[in-house]
Each structure stands twice: as structure tokens, then as C-alpha cells.
């Protein structure tokens, strides 16, 4: 299994298709997020799906149960591998979403705590736990309810794996080739994330902003076994 999910963070449909075509044999999946979905909607997802690369649709759904269930109903018709929704939307929201995808290819992945957030950010929201404790709590809830996996940083991946078992998928964003500063707070290198127990690592700019995205993806994959 190729653990790389390449984030196609663009509003340009042609650019997304070009990346997807060039990377389909180099990565495990491509990620389409809110930026792309706001610009192109379901039809844009269908166009990228024609490139024959699995799609991780990262919409982070978070609304009342009925609204999320109806949204999942619409999305399940798309050819996507995984769809994200916030675990903090609650048990009822998650269970109703799961009921929609029973027997379908699409897997529901729960978002724990955004990697852009740290302990101070959670405290401002009235969350008394530190980020790691909050992630573990939410991951255990997701597992109990029946979600297929979670999104969490590499800093929590090892404990999530211990608590939730080997078949529970762990997707890790906040992947950086070095420890530079940007909009992410809880980060790790690709190898650190995999060694911590992640099944998939989400990598965007180090691949898409390189002069040769396919070659960059190959080098990252090779670095995981060096």
C-alpha cells in the first residue's frame, strides 16, 4: 500500500486534473478539500475521479445530524474512497452518517483536533484537556461508533493505534519535509508519522510546488524505507 495522500489544494480544475494524472501511479490517493469543492462541486470531483486515482474528499462535515446525513447521501454517489467529518459533531450525527454508507465503498473518517490548533487554542474554546488527550478521547468515540478511522497528527498516532487497534485507519496531516514554521502547529516528517503508526500521510506543497511532482512523490516514498 502506498501511504501518500497528495493534497491537491487548488481552485484550478485543470491543474488538479494534471496533478492527478501525473501522480496516479506515485501516490495512494489524492485529497480534494473545501477550496476545490467550493469552486467545482461534485462535477469537479467526478472529473478528477476520471484520472483513475482514489480520492480522499476532505470536507470536514459538521452540522446537525439530518443535514450531514443528507449531504453524505449526495456524496456517496461520487467515486470517492474516503470522506471526512468532525467527530465533535456528536454521536447522533456520526451514526446517521454511517447509516447512509452501509454496504458502500466510501469510508467515513473522523476529524479529531485540527493540526493548526494547540493547547492554547483548545483552552480558548473551553476545552480543558490538552490536544493529545482530546484527540485520544475523540478517536475512541469514533472507534466505538464505527467510523473507519480518524485524522490526527503524528504526535498522537501511536496512542490512537494502541487504543483503537490495527484495523483502524489513521490519516496524518501536518507533514513537513523539515521543521519550518507555517500554519500548522503539530507537525512531523513523513518517516516520523509512519513510524508513529499512521497508515496514510497527507502531503501537499512539498509535492505539488516542486518542479517535478511525480519525482518528489517517489523520493518521499523511498525515504520511508531508507
Swiss-Prot record:
It catalyses: orotidine 5'-phosphate + H(+) = UMP + CO2. Its EC number is 4.1.1.23. GO terms for cellular component: cytosol. HAMAP family: OMPdecase_type1_B. The active site is at 60 (proton donor). Substrate binds at residues 9, 31, 58-67, 115, 176, 184, 204-205. Homodimer. The keyword Ribonucleoprotein does not apply. One of its GO terms (molecular function) is orotidine-5'-phosphate decarboxylase activity. Catalyzes the decarboxylation of orotidine 5'-monophosphate (OMP) to uridine 5'-monophosphate (UMP). Belongs to the OMP decarboxylase family. Type 1 subfamily. Pathway: Pyrimidine metabolism; UMP biosynthesis via de novo pathway; UMP from orotate: step 2/2. Keywords: Decarboxylase, Lyase, Pyrimidine biosynthesis. GO terms for biological process: 'de novo' pyrimidine nucleobase biosynthetic process; 'de novo' UMP biosynthetic process. This is Orotidine 5'-phosphate decarboxylase.
Amino acid at each position: 500500500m502506498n501511504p501518500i495522500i497528495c493534497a491537491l489544494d487548488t481552485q484550478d480544475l485543470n491543474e488538479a486534473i494534471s496533478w492527478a494524472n501525473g501522480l496516479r501511479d506515485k501516490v495512494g490517493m489524492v485529497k480534494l478539500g473545501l477550496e476545490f469543492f467550493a469552486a467545482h462541486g461534485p462535477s469537479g470531483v467526478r472529473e478528477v475521479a476520471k484520472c483513475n486515482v482514489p480520492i480522499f474528499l476532505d470536507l470536514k462535515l459538521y452540522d446537525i445530524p439530518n443535514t450531514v446525513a443528507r449531504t453524505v447521501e449526495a456524496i456517496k454517489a461520487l467515486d470517492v474512497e474516503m470522506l471526512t467529518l468532525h467527530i465533535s459533531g456528536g454521536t447522533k450525527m456520526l451514526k446517521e452518517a454511517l447509516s447512509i454508507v452501509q454496504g458502500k465503498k466510501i469510508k467515513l473518517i473522523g476529524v479529531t483536533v485540527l493540526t493548526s490548533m494547540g493547547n492554547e487554542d483548545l483552552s480558548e474554546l473551553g476545552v480543558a484537556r490538552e490536544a493529545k488527550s482530546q484527540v485520544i478521547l475523540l478517536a475512541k468515540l469514533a472507534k466505538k461508533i464505527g467510523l473507519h478511522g480518524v485524522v490526527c497528527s503524528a504526535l498522537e498516532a501511536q496512542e490512537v493505534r494502541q487504543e483503537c487497534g490495527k484495523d483502524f485507519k489513521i490519516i496524518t496531516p501536518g507533514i513537513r519535509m523539515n521543521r519550518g514554521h507555517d500554519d500548522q502547529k503539530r507537525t512531523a516528517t513523513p518517516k516520523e508519522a509512519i513510524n508513529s503508526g499512521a497508515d496514510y500521510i497527507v502531503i501537499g506543497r512539498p509535492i505539488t510546488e516542486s518542479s517535478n511532482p511525480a519525482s518528489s512523490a517517489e523520493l518521499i516514498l523511498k525515504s520511508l524505507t531508507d
